[in-house]
Amino acid sequence: MSLEFGREVTGRLDVAESREWLVTNGIGGFASGTVASTLTRRYHGLLVAALEPPLGRTLLVAKLEESLECRGEPRALSTNRWADRSIAPLGYRDVERFRLEGTTPVWTFAWRDVAVEKRVFMEPGANTTYVCYRLLRATDPVTVELRALVNYRDYHGTTRGAGWQMQVTPVAEGVRIVAFDGARPFVLLGRLEGTPTPAASAGGPGGPGLLPTSSMPGPSVEVRPAHAWYYGFRLAREEERGLDAQDDHLHAGTFRATLAQGHELTVVLSSEPAVSTAGAEAWQRRERHEAGVLAAWRRTSTGGERPPDWVRQLVLAADQFVVRRPLPGEPEGLTIIAGYPWFGDWGRDTMIALPGLTLTTGRPGHARRILSTFARFMDRGMLPNRFPDAGQAPEYNSVDATLWYVEAIRAYHAATEDDGLLKELYPVLAEMIRWHRQGTRHGIAEDPADGLLQAGEPGVQLTWMDARVGERVVTPRTGKAVEVNALWYNALRVMAAFASRVGRESEQWAGLADRVRTGFGRFWNEATGHLMDVIDGPDGADDRLRPNQLFAVSLSESPLSAARQRKVVNACARHLLTSVGLRSLDPRHPGYRGRYAGGPSERDSAYHQGTVWGWLLGPFALAYHRVYGDRETARGFLRPLAQQLVAYGVGSLGEIFDGDAPHAPRGTIAQAWTVAETLRAWTVLAP
């Protein structure tokens, strides 16, 4: 499929703003914005640096205000929404084409006989963004002027700039900025590359659309330090979300260069102590990185089929979530960002996403490092659910993250037969189960009466349905949750297999699993023909139809008979299935909310009360195949997600959708477990 738009999208501001792009650097930093180049979220910017990888994410550079001048006539290429609700300038009207090359966004601006190409990409492993402008055609020289708008704030916040004096200092090729005493310095640098000949514009050794790395003399880029606040950017998406929707940014420097055909102007934005301004060489490094990602995937692709282009794109998207988490004694630790632009690394999300992001894409070494990294954080039999951005202690408020960890290790071992890691982690897993049986935080403990896991205490959300409004947990699910006990049964069966593999006693695990399977029968609701969502809660059983019961079918070990598995799949298909995921609640229930919109309390009240979750389509497709044996139909459930790669987060899959048709995309523009589970299910279902 073509990840490309013409003026039918780029020329309509509301449509161009509804499509967002994302580039990442592998350490938690990123750049993101809209196809229209407007700032509509507080998270939009050209350099959101992970100053304490993978977190500490700080907006350093918001945007470059772009303009051209040809034959003495200026033309603004930028577009901004302002607090007074005006829109100026209107540069989006000159965007002739937008496309992705790999994960790199590329714009073509066309004005009269002038055409300029712009691309934005990041240096792998560094808080460095390259913004490259290449003159494609013009009958006369064209002057490009770029005003750099900077900031220095937490990426969740907004800025009021009045009275804030930053230190802007000229340096070779640009300016150095110190926002306040103790702030991390960052630089804005400019360089002109290429040979001004018509032949050069066809491309060259620098890669498609880029030039050889010969550099023009430094003075050919004029750099002027500045210090002028631009007040009142209106963040339309934040306004829709009921949040502070006004932001200010500092104009800290202007870059000006005259381009002949074949020239390329590169502006480098970086918080690194040393950085190269050679844009063409940086682009080659970016290309090599993505080529390596695809090569690893191709080596492990199953069967003789040629995967569709949208699956190939998801492999590149998968790479964006896997980032470094350095630890004492383990500088190469890895983790998974749950979603861009606002999530950090979450234990549950990491373990659910790990097989699809690493094993399916042919990178088991990454999976091993992630599993080893998280083992370091095991405490009282629990993995952390969240690592706060501000560097506080991890939060241990998940009943299922550790159970998903067991399943992730199972998937890793099935793919690699790495007995070495299994022997290393087996004692950790055995200790985890001991804690779960005897009791750990938040009332998580085995019920000796039936062997099932129970969990919950007032004010604490423990399952993946974890929304809260103030102090109220929207879906508390206190008691024995169905997917938790499906995972518990799966973990015990897996531990029995692990024990045999490493030469330990397996009967104890098998005996516990048999007991749980018997107890799991209590979830069955004969009247409705599906499983209860929670039993033994404060108010008894909760018989609402939710997708959580699917995991009793889709996991490697199922506690259900074949007949009941089929009934579960049928119930979910009839009432929860959509073309983009599964609803989190049966629409027939009076608590159903079909639209995810409004302020934080309204949105959180709908988050798991009908909102569609894309990641659930993978488990559903696998469950369907398990009971019906029809690979082609099962894969057919996944195919509509291909259209989402051009509908919201371009080149990726987002988090959630409205429960009601037409199922508008909401939430994050790129969600790890949506990408991962789609990739994993597609691969497992290969003929």
Q: Where do the PLM segments sit?
A:
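Acidic, mature catalytic/reactive cores of soluble proteins
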Residues: M1-P687
